[in-house]
Amino acid sequence: MTSPAKFKKDKEIIAEYDTQVKEIRAQLTEQMKCLDQQCELRVQLLQDLQDFFRKKAEIEMDYSRNLEKLAERFLAKTCSTKDQQFKKDQNVLSPVNCWNLLLNQVKRESRDHTTLSDIYLNNIIPRFVQVSEDSGRLFKKSKEVGQQLQDDLMKVLNELYSVMKTYHMYNADSISAQSKLKEAEKQEEKQIGKSVKQEDRQTPRSPDSTANVRIEEKHVRRSSVKKIEKMKEKRQAKYTENKLKAIKARNEYLLALEATNASVFKYYIHDLSDLIDCCDLGYHASLNRALRTFLSAELNLEQSKHEGLDAIENAVENLDATSDKQRLMEMYNNVFCPPMKFEFQPHMGDMASQLCAQQPVQSELLQRCQQLQSRLSTLKIENEEVKKTMEATLQTIQDIVTVEDFDVSDCFQYSNSMESVKSTVSETFMSKPSIAKRRANQQETEQFYFTVRECYGF
Amino acid sequence: MTSPAKFKKDKEIIAEYDTQVKEIRAQLTEQMKCLDQQCELRVQLLQDLQDFFRKKAEIEMDYSRNLEKLAERFLAKTCSTKDQQFKKDQNVLSPVNCWNLLLNQVKRESRDHTTLSDIYLNNIIPRFVQVSEDSGRLFKKSKEVGQQLQDDLMKVLNELYSVMKTYHMYNADSISAQSKLKEAEKQEEKQIGKSVKQEDRQTPRSPDSTANVRIEEKHVRRSSVKKIEKMKEKRQAKYTENKLKAIKARNEYLLALEATNASVFKYYIHDLSDLIDCCDLGYHASLNRALRTFLSAELNLEQSKHEGLDAIENAVENLDATSDKQRLMEMYNNVFCPPMKFEFQPHMGDMASQLCAQQPVQSELLQRCQQLQSRLSTLKIENEEVKKTMEATLQTIQDIVTVEDFDVSDCFQYSNSMESVKSTVSETFMSKPSIAKRRANQQETEQFYFTVRECYGF
């Protein structure tokens, strides 16, 4: 009746179920391990972030101190060596103004990097400490919850196992009862078969036909038939009972199967996701705020620095020789102001304070005047030429000294490799052959300019 | 004839002139001193600028090295402790991405500050060296030219002095000759007066009336008159000659006066200005370029840093729990993927794989179903309540962890005094009472959230 090729044996079914449950149990363990690992990584990351910002705070503080020292060194120098009025005087000159702003900028940057360091230590790191605490606490709680969920799931799986086994048992009982019933039926059949052989063949082979047999035989047969009937009835009852139990057990198994699948689905699809959500509760948002604090600090530093650079740029734009000359001359007014005109001093009450241009000096003066006029017009022509040469020479010098060679953007365009920065950068200003050539040209032109000036009475 | 109250004496005039020339000479000396001082200050300023940038280059290099070490420390850690695949896996998580970008940023800043240092050393400082050389050379030449101009001016002043003295001399000679002439005229007059007394009173008192006197007396008188006449003629001639000389001398003096005043004017108004221009030739322009190189370097650094911060900001914006959860589950797919559904395992070829819901189990199942439905509707109502509570609690936590408390602009707003930065800044994050309160609230809410979840089966 049982065909091994067709039906799985109980053992096989149990073994399969065991395997399936073992796999799930292994997964559950791995899930916990995975959460542990994520927790560990998160704790490590937050520790790294703290260490990173602690170390960076030190670096920023170091940088700030060095910048402050640098500024103080030159500010002290300016304050000590010269008296205050002199210093104040010099400040009106545009290059000195640039220099002062440079020093101010260094002071400003020093201060800003101290602030940055302070924000790292007193704001950003505490945030990471908090995130770390929160994460640890949430992971712990989530793991507890997760463990409970897993235990519940395992309970469901065990229940399914037990329900399945019950079903097997009751079904086996039912099958057994059925086979026993069938056996009884067979025996009854056999008994009836005997009666038919020993008696008339007319009699149909039914228990009711026993009325026709002989009394004695009849009695024996009747008692035997009754026995079998009784047994059959018993077995029938047993079978019916077992069959019902098996049906109920199967129903329980089927219901437990649905419930287990639903539980497994709920655990894998919802609970695990919720569990990770609980571990993450606020993590990303808090990390976001900590990093935004960092960004806010950096951007404020940048803005402050930029403001300083703007001030310097403005001062550089105002570098102006003409106004500096004006300021210098005003500053040393007594040194540069022209003296009183020399007045005619009449000798012993000499009344004539005008040039006497009458005879006999008239002709001589006229001649002299003509000579001077002729000399003057020659000089004027010469002068025009010299002026043109000088202007052209000056323009050449101006062109040389105002060439726009100050853009260093190239130096900040690195190759993707991030390597060999030095070699790229060092090729800048001085090593360019064009610079040397330009400088030679500048000095030559300058020399020429001076020569021309000197030759023609400045 | 000379009235001391009315005319200045020669000595006074000479003394006044001397004083005036001395004053000019003192001014000229001061002018040279002033140029020297400006040259010295300029050389000093350029030296200071070189020292400043040399020292700043060191500071930037130091800063760069420290940043590099910082980045390497954590990058090495990430590389060594875990295998590459694992690291790669983790990189898909948004917090790890932020962390990697932070380290990248430090590397980028390290590189940029090296570049900055390099530009200081190899571009900006050489520029200042050049400007210093140029300035020194130009000052030297300008001073030579200035000295020549001053010598020329002194020559003109000396000439004026000598011309003035000549005028004084010739005018004195002229006056003397005139007075001698006048004396002769007086004598002649006297002689004629004698003749008139000794002779007729009719005769007019003229030299021609001598014809009427006695021969002897006539002869004596005539010879005396002739003598006087001769002397007078001589004196007349002398006077005329001296007068002409005096006029010429005065003319020379007046011309020299004009020339001197013009020279002085030219020197004070044009030459001094030109001299300063020559000292400044290219100075402001070259300084401008050197400082613009500095600005270009700083602005490029700023831009590069800003790009890095933008990348970090973008990563911070992309901090997302949901997608991280998704990625984690994909990463550990074998751990998180739901197992196969549990299938009905028929026992010994049991053909019924469906719930048997006929008599005699029907009524029992129906009863059970009704019980479950009633329980389910109770749970649904409860669930709705719990869900609402949980959502509200979660929202509270979300509100706490997403509060926008990351703006640190205030820390960069210093008081004008630039002092007491520390005290202002340290009042930030942790010391605020609101933070402690908020944290307590957060943990309480979190606890409540977990309790609710646990009570109602997660």
UniProtKB/Swiss-Prot annotation, chains A, B:
Function noted in UniProt: May regulate cell migration and differentiation through interaction with and inhibition of SRGAP2. In contrast to SRGAP2C, it is not able to induce long-lasting changes in synaptic density throughout adulthood.
Basic and acidic residues composition-biased segments: 181-203
Gene3D superfamilies: Arfaptin homology (AH) domain/BAR domain
Keywords: Coiled coil, Neurogenesis
Any one GO BP annotation for this protein: negative regulation of cell migration
Domain F-BAR, first and last residues per copy: 22-324
Leader sequence segment: none
Coiled-coil portions: 362-400
Region (Disordered): 181-214
Quaternary structure, from the entry: May interact with SRGAP2; formation of the heterodimer alters SRGAP2 function.
Organism superkingdom: Eukaryota
Disulfide bonds listed in the record: none
Protein name, as recorded: SLIT-ROBO Rho GTPase-activating protein 2B
A Pfam family annotated for this UniProt entry: FCH
GO CC annotation: cytoplasm; glutamatergic synapse
Something else known: This is one of the 3 duplications of the ancestral gene SRGAP2/SRGAP2A which has undergone human-specific segmental gene duplications. The appearance of SRGAP2B in the human genome is estimated to 3,4 million years. Two larger duplications later copied SRGAP2B to chromosome 1p12 (SRGAP2C) and to proximal 1q21.1 (SRGAP2D). SRGAP2B was identified in some individuals but it is not clear if it produces a functional protein.
